[in-house]
Curated annotation (Swiss-Prot):
It comes from Burkholderia mallei (strain ATCC 23344). The gene is dctA. SUPFAM superfamilies: Proton glutamate symport protein. The chain crosses the membrane at residues 8-28, 44-64, 78-98, 148-168, 184-204, 222-242, 307-327, 355-375. Responsible for the transport of dicarboxylates such as succinate, fumarate, and malate from the periplasm across the membrane. It is found in: Cell inner membrane. GO terms for molecular function: fumarate transmembrane transporter activity; malate:proton symporter activity; succinate transmembrane transporter activity. This is C4-dicarboxylate transport protein. GO terms for biological process: L-aspartate transmembrane transport. It is a multi-pass membrane protein. Keywords: Cell inner membrane, Cell membrane, Membrane, Symport, Transmembrane, Transmembrane helix, Transport.
Length: 428
């Protein structure tokens, strides 16, 4: 029996977002007080992200038997991430050259006050490549889970799963126990997800109430350029990859619409991570691939952030009438490929990575970031949406490369008949 439309989660989330926008516009002081609703929902989701990643990766690797496969899957995922991330960076650069959203501002860099972005610049200079690599190793196992550090948890899970795979039948009891914990954790996610409309309402009301719709007007061209470029990236770049793999990007986006709406309402791609992992398994991707690709993708495959990076730098250059040589732009691409890695989960990640990138192109003033500080919050939704679609597609692609994609389940899921096909398992 079909649910009444008002009981469907994505309908509830859409309604909550609309109400949040209305409240934020007409009653901004009250709307700002709604912030704890959004923050609380995201905290509830983050509460289970670490344990879910640990359990999913451990059970996936423990069932692989062949440990060479773990390295193979990881290698293929990283290769895919680099290729697609580069496409996103180049597309952001090309779109800004074509649409020229910064032309006409004629801003004198000397008049810009960089105090508002000083904290982001300090964070950007504060972490070197060595610091980043050392940060992957936790002080203790407990500390990794307590801090919610995805890379650290992933490292622990890889080691734990590898040992269980080596033990074979002797480790079966532990593997079965962790698998049972996984089911409990996803049950918790189902309960928490029902609160998504409340979280989306609170986050959207706060955003509109604090920043106001009026703050968008002067920079609408940049916002429009970014949103348009992201749509083109999803439909053309990811669409071509999806078609080559044997599925429709439009149907895939429709399949994860609830997760996308949660991301839209909360501006956090992490808010939908557990649900995305579960849906990808239901769509025929193997648990081992989902467990490895999705968490690493949230750190190394930030397509939306990559588009934003090159676009923001070139926008600042155009707005301040600074001409960049092709060599400087190629340097920008190379640096952005490095600075964007591992940015997910860091407060103000977009601005921190942008500051790190600008530091390598000294002709563009760091204070130019002030120009987009006010609208960054409105662009974060698009970044997060593009990131989650990109990671979903990446997981399906790597599963197909590994011949661990159940195409019968995938077709059924994307056509809306996932449950009916649940029993069909024809690995291809």
């Amino acid at each position: 029996m079909k649910k009444p439309f008002y009981k469907v989660l994505y309908v509830q989330v859409i309604f909550a977002i609309v109400v949040g926008v209305i409240l934020g516009h007409y009653y901004p002081s009250l709307a700002v007080d709604m912030k704890p609703l959004g923050d609380g929902f995201i905290k509830l989701i983050k509460m289970v992200i670490g344990p879910i990643i640990f359990c999913t990766v451990v059970t996936g690797i423990a069932g692989m038997q062949d440990m060479k496969k773990v390295g193979r899957v990881g290698g293929k995922a990283l290769l895919y991430f680099e290729i697609v991330s580069t496409c996103a960076l180049v597309l952001g650069l090309a779109a800004t050259h074509i649409l020229r959203p910064g032309v006409g501002f004629n801003i004198d860099p000397a008049t810009l006050n960089g105090k508002e972005v000083a904290s982001y610049a300090a964070k950007a200079h504060g972490q070197s490549s060595v610091d980043f690599l050392m940060h992957i190793i936790p002080n203790t196992m407990i500390d990794a889970f307590a801090q919610g550090e995805i890379l650290q948890i992933l490292l622990i899970a890889l080691l734990f799963g590898s040992v269980l795979a080596h033990l074979g039948e002797r480790g079966r009891v532990v593997t079965d126990f962790i698998d049972g914990i996984t089911r409990v954790l996803f049950g918790i996610v189902h309960i928490v997800t029902k609160l998504a409309p409340i979280g989306a309402f609170g986050a959207m009301a706060f955003t509109i109430g604090k920043y106001g719709v009026g703050s968008l007007v002067p920079l609408l061209k940049l916002i429009g350029t970014f949103y348009l470029t992201s749509v083109v990236f999803v439909l053309v770049v990811l669409g071509a990859i999806a078609r080559f793999t044997g599925f429709s990007i439009i149907r895939f986006v429709g399949y994860i619409k609830e997760e996308l709406l949660i991301v839209l309402g909360t501006s956090s791609s992490e808010a939908a991570l557990p649900q995305l992992m579960e849906k990808l398994e239901k769509a025929g991707c193997s648990r081992s691939v989902v467990g490895l690709v999705v968490p690493t993708g949230y750190l190394f495959n930030l397509d939306g952030t990559n588009i934003y990076m090159t676009m923001a730098v070139l926008f600042i250059a155009q707005a301040t009438n600074i001409e960049l040589t092709w060599m400087q732009q190629l340097t920008l691409l190379a640096v952005a490929m490095l600075t964007s890695k591992g940015a997910s989960g860091v407060t103000g990640a977009g601005f921190i990575t942008l500051a790190a990138t600008l530091a390598v192109v000294p002709t563009i003033p760091l204070s130019g970031m002030v120009l987009i500080l006010g609208i960054d919050r409105f662009m974060s939704e698009c970044r997060a949406l593009t990131n989650i679609v990109g990671n979903g597609v990446a997981t399906v692609v790597v599963s197909a490369w590994e011949k661990e994609l159940d195409r019968a389940k995938l077709r059924a899921a994307l056509s809306g008949n996932g449950e009916a096909a649940a029993g069909e398992a024809a690995r291809v």
